[in-house]
Amino acid sequence: MRLVLAVGLVSLGGCASTGEERDPRDPLEGFNRGVYRFNEGFDDWIAKPVARTYRKALHQEIRSRVGNFFANVQDIFIGVNNFLQGKLEDGVNDWARFAFNSTFGLLGLHDVASDMGLEKHNEDFGQTFGRWGVPPGPYLILPFLGSSTVRDGAGTALDYYFAPLTEVRPIELRNTLFGLYLVNTRADLLDASQLLEEAALDKYTFQRDAFLQRRRSLIYDGNPPREKLE
């Protein structure tokens, strides 16, 4: 499960660009800005108030344990994606993290693996497609999920299809866990979204550029090749 969910909930709208300013990576900008405004409304009226109430109700230490639990579950398919990308040592590291945190860390509530020197990675199927040479395609804003690309959208579908939480039964428990994940993640991003509101003149453009730059960096593990200039 990817934090793209959280990024989507932080989406805030901006004014439309002129044709001269149109970014070639974003040919669907008109459509995207419409979805962006929808996400902004959902965030302002539902997601953000719920997250604020949640943060007031639970101490930061408890919220941290909740985040650790979900991060531990994610390590399973982070490892799978590292294997698919040919990074065998990192994949073994990820599965070792899951094993140690699930046992000695009490189902992942405590991140003992990091204390043991096992690094936390960030991988998903969208990054795997990128490593395989699949082009990103146009930038997209997805309803509720936020920033993506055609490639990452396909990756997101696989991320959720294979997410371990989808196998949890009964369905009521599964839905409760998904809801807890979303609210806890949004609560962690409240301060970041406030900074975005204060810093960016056109928040849509700021978020788009930051997202595309970050995804490119993640695909190449922080060392992307120099982009060719037209």
Indicate where each model-derived feature is located.
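Mid-length scaffold segments of soluble, non-membrane domains
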Residues: N72-V150
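Beta-rich strand-turn-strand
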Residues: G67-F69
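Bacterial N-terminal signal peptides that target proteins for export
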Residues: M1-V4
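Post-signal peptide N-terminal segment of mature Sec-exported envelope proteins
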Residues: D23-I46
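Membrane interface segments of multi-pass transport proteins and intramembrane proteases
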Residues: W45, V50-E61
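C-terminal motif of bacterial Sec signal peptides marking the signal peptidase cleavage site
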Residues: S11-G14
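A structured, mid-to-C-terminal "fold-capping" secondary-structure block
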Residues: G19-R22, Q127, W132-E230
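A small/polar active-site loop signature that marks catalytic segments
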Residues: S64
